[in-house]
């Protein structure tokens, strides 16, 4: 059933017969158009998320305005043909439009009582605010008069027309939106009013005429008056919006395929701006910031839906609707209960009340913070709605990084400049910037920034991604800034009405304080605070909800999860986050302390082996102490210690910093200099050339393991390319273990796989290894011939922008590296079935890479401590997906 609003008021229409008629008269071409009553939520790939859920809501009897959906297939065909409609699409749109007009008793463009429609995008994967929408389509100078007569409200008709001209000219004709906003500002100033809603019918009619003139001047042609021409242009514009820079940027950040395309939804307009008995709003079935089971959202009286999400006006909390619209609020509560019960998940719903009649315009799974995500699924399990395994699969593993966000130190003193809406939790410190381009540039350069705007728009997405947080003067909890920030885990404070932004001067003032671009500020998105200067932050505390969900994940996963940690403090943090051991402990970091570096340099500068051994004897106690601390922190879990890897010159000062008279040091620095040190004298090559270095490290490990009861040390040799290298290093390691009386400790000896030759010939190396660990950072560099620093600094961003690469290979495992890993697993286990295999690059915390590691049968992944929860959840999801 669908709800049609025609001359006889709201009525219900059955479409089954009509749909059959339409289908029978269509030519034998692809079905590019579906009525809302002709689809279901299972057709997301065809109808897009919005269209599929409109169809689903129609089927369960919710009051959804009538309409139809142009499919994603039509979009893909249109884009592939360079902007030409595929065969049959025009006829199908015409027939479905005729059916809509007949059911609603109104005609598009009718001069007496016109049918108006909205044209909205709908990707198969939610992309809030990234693509285009046009409202009130079908208006022209004649039909706007008919709308005024049929509605009995001249102001409403004039407002609808100026909105349509503004949207259509911007979205379809490409006229810059600022030109219209400037005209509105001039009109308000001339009439001495502050808000758009204070402009009367005459002012709005004048604005519509001015908008038409702006469009004519900017495009060099008349604004289209024919409703079908308007509709065709709008459909094409929505198709084209799939490839706008902001949409592509969002997809790249969220890992969404560029090949999906967007559907287009054409829906009968219902109006929240007909007067004080009309309203529009956005509401969530649960709080998307905390997960609390309470209606969360906002509404505006006498407004259209875009006013809420665009943040142009700061709306009212949804609870106030109970007093203003008691009947509408009851219908809203019923609809929200129905929707959450049907979808078994938190829903994000758009609604409109038109002269007392309640309509649902959209539902989708609500974007939520990680904190809310774990609470919602835990509550749904407690309520008996979903099972534990489904709860684990529901949480976005990559999103768990958000739970690692710091908070403001409770003991800190600071000056609160202003308060706003706590739109997205977490605290952020950075320098104020006032446009998205600056935020992107400074953020990419490694500078923490806070993006400050009147309100954000979808075009700001590239700046939001690079900023530490977002601060806006306008907009509410469901505005674009709030929704996008929550989805990305960025702290956000919205609706700070006391904020006075001077974009030209690049500064803002609030309550007597002026903050200029580059000044440090802090925001607390959990409490809605804007703070002067940089405040100290403290690490996050894990919640009971988080602990419950990750415990369920541990029950489901096969893959072990370890952490990369070089200090006892890192090791303790890793244990707190659930790490089952240390997969990579880098020993070189231990040589840089104030007491240690001079001794390390003394060892490097020694003239002979005797001198080196004397210096190493002084370094040994430092190493042993560090290893004891890490082994104690891991409480019997395995600790894989990598022997010295970087070239020795890294421990010496730069040549230009050395006193010219110090010839000995200058000579040694010059002798160690290499053209390509990454492929030079490093890793196990150091152990072969200077075995005394590795002997000292192995002694320190064995002595530490003997001192810490129940410890499980493992020794890993880096950069092995040849079996003969590992054989010699194993002989050295076993000899020292025996000399130190560590034979009964069961210390495992293994190697990193970070050179393609080692991966290709792993069957030759495996006999000498108890375990192999893929060093995927270096393996990616050696496989792709990419220097990470040079690639990320010079060309990688352009490769991603131009789709030469779809993903950053240093974040997600490249297919070539995956092929080498698969080859290694097969060949190593072919000669040594029980060999332990894992990875220890940062890829170990990337959900997509974790899924691959699970699929090829690795035993564990290892990542930074703060990514351990993500890896635990991703490992469980990978296992559950294959059950």
Model regions and ranges:
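Conserved alpha/beta-domain cores
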Residues: 120-121, 542, 552-883
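N-terminal beta-alpha lobe that positions the nucleotide/phosphoryl donor
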Residues: 13-265, 410-454, 500-507, 511, ...
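Conserved phosphate/anionic-ligand binding catalytic regions in large, soluble enzymes, centered on
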Residues: 45-74, 116-144, 164-167, 172, ...
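Terminal amphipathic helices with adjacent charged low-complexity linkers/tails
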Residues: 70-78, 178-205, 299, 345-416, ...
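ATP-dependent carboxylate/acyl-activation modules
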Residues: 29-32, 40-41, 162-166, 229, ...
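Phosphate-interacting basic helix/loop segments used at nucleotide- and nucleic-acid interfaces
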Residues: 93-111, 218-228, 245, 325-348, ...
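Conformationally flexible catalytic loops at phosphate/diphosphate-handling active centers
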Residues: 436-513
């Amino acid at each position: 059933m669908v709800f049609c609003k025609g001359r006889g008021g709201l009525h219900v229409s059955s479409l089954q017969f009509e749909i059959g008629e339409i289908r029978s008269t269509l030519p034998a071409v692809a079905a590019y158009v579906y009525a809302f009553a002709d689809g279901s939520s299972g057709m997301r790939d065809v109808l897009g998320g919005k269209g599929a859920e409109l169809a689903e809501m129609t089927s369960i009897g919710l009051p959804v305005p009538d309409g139809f959906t142009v499919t994603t297939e039509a979009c893909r065909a249109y884009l592939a043909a360079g902007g030409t409609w595929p065969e049959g699409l025009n006829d199908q749109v015409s027939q479905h439009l005729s059916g809509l007009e007949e059911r609603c008793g109104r005609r598009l463009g009718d001069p007496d009582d016109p049918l108006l429609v909205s044209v909205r995008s709908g990707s198969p994967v939610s992309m809030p605010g990234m693509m285009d929408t046009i409202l009130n389509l079908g208006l022209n100078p004649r039909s706007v008069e008919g709308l005024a007569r049929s509605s009995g409200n001249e102001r409403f008709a004039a407002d609808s027309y100026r909105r349509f001209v503004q949207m259509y000219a911007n979205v379809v004709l490409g006229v810059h939106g600022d030109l219209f906003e400037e005209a509105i500002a001039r009109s308000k100033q001339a009439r001495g009013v502050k808000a758009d809603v204070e402009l009367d019918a005459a002012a709005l009619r004048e604005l519509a005429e001015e908008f038409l003139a702006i469009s004519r001047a900017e495009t060099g042609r008349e604004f289209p008056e024919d409703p079908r021409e308007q509709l065709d242009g709008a459909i094409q514009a929505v198709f084209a919006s799939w490839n706008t820079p902001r949409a592509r940027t969002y997809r790249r950040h969220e890992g969404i395929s560029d090949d999906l395309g967007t559907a287009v939804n054409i829906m009968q307009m219902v109006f929240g701006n007909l007067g004080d008995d009309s309203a529009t709003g956005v509401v969530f079935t649960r709080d998307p910031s905390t997960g609390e089971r309470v209606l969360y959202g906002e509404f505006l009286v006498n407004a259209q839906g875009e006013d809420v999400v665009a943040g142009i006006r700061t709306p009212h909390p949804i609870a106030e609707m109970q007093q203003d619209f008691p009947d509408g609020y009851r219908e809203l509560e019923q609809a929200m209960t129905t929707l959450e019960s049907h979808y078994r998940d938190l829903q994000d719903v758009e609604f409109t009340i038109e002269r007392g009649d309640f309509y649902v315009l959209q539902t989708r799974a609500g974007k939520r913070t990680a904190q809310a995500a774990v609470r919602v699924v835990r509550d749904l399990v407690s309520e008996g709605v979903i099972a534990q395994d489904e709860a684990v699969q529901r949480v976005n593993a990559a999103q768990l990084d958000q739970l690692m966000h710091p908070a403001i130190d409770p003991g800190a003193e600071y000056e609160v400049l202003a308060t706003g809406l706590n739109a997205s939790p977490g605290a952020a410190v950075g320098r104020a910037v006032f446009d998205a381009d600056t935020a992107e540039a400074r953020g990419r350069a490694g500078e923490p920034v806070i993006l400050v705007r009147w309100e954000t728009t979808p075009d700001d997405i590239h700046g939001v991604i690079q900023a530490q947080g977002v601060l806006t003067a306008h907009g509410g909890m469901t505005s674009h800034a709030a929704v996008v920030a929550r989805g990305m885990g960025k702290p956000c404070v919205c609706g700070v009405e006391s904020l006075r932004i001077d974009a030209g001067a690049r500064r803002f003032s609030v309550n007597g304080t002026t903050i200029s671009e580059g000044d440090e500020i802090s925001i607390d998105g959990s409490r809605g605070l804007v703070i002067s200067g940089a405040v100290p932050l403290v690490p996050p505390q894990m919640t009971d909800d988080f602990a419950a969900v990750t415990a369920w994940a541990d029950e489901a996963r096969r893959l072990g999860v370890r952490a990369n940690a070089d200090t006892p403090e890192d090791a303790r943090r890793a244990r707190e986050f659930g790490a089952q051991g240390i997969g990579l402990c880098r020993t070189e970091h231990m040589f840089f302390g104030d007491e240690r570096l001079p001794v390390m340099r003394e060892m490097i500068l020694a003239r002979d082996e005797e001198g080196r051994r004397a210096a190493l004897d002084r370094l040994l106690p430092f190493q042993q102490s560090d290893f004891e601390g890490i082994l104690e922190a891991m409480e019997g879990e395995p600790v894989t210690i990598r022997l010295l890897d970087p070239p020795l010159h890294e421990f010496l000062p730069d040549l230009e910093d050395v006193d010219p008279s110090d010839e000995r040091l200058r000579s040694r620095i010059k002798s160690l200099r290499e053209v390509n040190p990454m492929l030079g004298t490093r890793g196990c090559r150091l152990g072969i050339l200077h075995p005394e270095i590795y002997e000292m490290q192995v002694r320190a490990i064995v002595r530490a393991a003997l001192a810490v009861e129940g410890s499980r040390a493992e020794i890993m040799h880096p950069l092995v390319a040849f079996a003969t290298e590992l054989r010699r290093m194993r002989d050295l390691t076993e000899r020292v273990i025996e000399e130190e009386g560590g034979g009964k400790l069961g210390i495992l000896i293994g190697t990193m796989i970070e050179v393609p030759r080692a991966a290709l010939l792993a069957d030759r190396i495996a006999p000498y290894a108890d375990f192999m660990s893929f060093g995927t950072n270096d393996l990616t560099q050696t496989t792709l011939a990419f220097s990470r620093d040079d690639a990320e600094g010079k060309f990688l961003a352009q490769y991603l922008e131009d789709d030469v690469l779809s993903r950053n290979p240093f974040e997600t495992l490249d297919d070539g590296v995956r092929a080498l890993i698969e080859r290694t697993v097969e060949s190593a286990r072919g000669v040594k079935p029980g060999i332990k295999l894992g990875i220890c690059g940062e890829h170990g915390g990337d959900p997509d890479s974790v899924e691959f590691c699970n699929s090829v049968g690795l035993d564990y992944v290892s990542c930074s401590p703060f990514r351990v929860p993500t890896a635990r959840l991703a490992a469980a999801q990978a296992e559950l997906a294959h059950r």
